[in-house]
From Swiss-Prot:
Keywords: Membrane, Transmembrane, Transmembrane helix. It is found in: Membrane. This is Putative uncharacterized protein YBL100C. It is a single-pass membrane protein. It comes from the Eukaryota. Almost completely overlaps ATP1. GO terms for cellular component: endoplasmic reticulum membrane. The lineage of its organism: Eukaryota, Fungi, Dikarya, Ascomycota, Saccharomycotina. The chain crosses the membrane at residues 77-98.
Length: 104
């Protein structure tokens, strides 16, 4: 029985590396850089900066949410207190004032 040979693609060495002697456009002298793309790429720095910005935005959003909950809790507590006062007033008017009017 004839089998097809198993082949796999061999990655290109230039896909993830840069030449060791790399010349920047701003200077005429070649610089010796690392051949690893991760160390020479600004992409990693941009990703890290983007993650930092997103983390700061998330922290600011969380702080705003916590403050909103505090404000809403204060308003809810104030509303509950107002309801208790109103209920107490109605209870007083209903129980004491109505009983006094029947006795006289």
């Amino acid at each position: 029985m004839l089998f097809k040979p198993k082949t796999r693609a061999i990655p290109s060495p230039t896909a993830r590396t840069l030449p060791v002697s790399f010349k920047l456009a701003s200077s005429d002298t070649p610089l010796i850089l690392s051949s690893k793309m991760e160390e020479t790429s600004v992409g990693c720095a941009l990703v890290e900066a983007n993650l930092l910005v997103e983390a700061k935005a998330a922290a600011a959003g969380l702080a705003a949410l916590v403050e909103l909950i505090r404000v809403l809790d204060r308003e809810r507590i104030a509303a509950v207190r107002a309801n208790i006062i109103i209920c107490a007033c109605f209870f007083y008017l209903f129980c004491y004032c109505s009983c006094d009017s029947y006795e006289s």
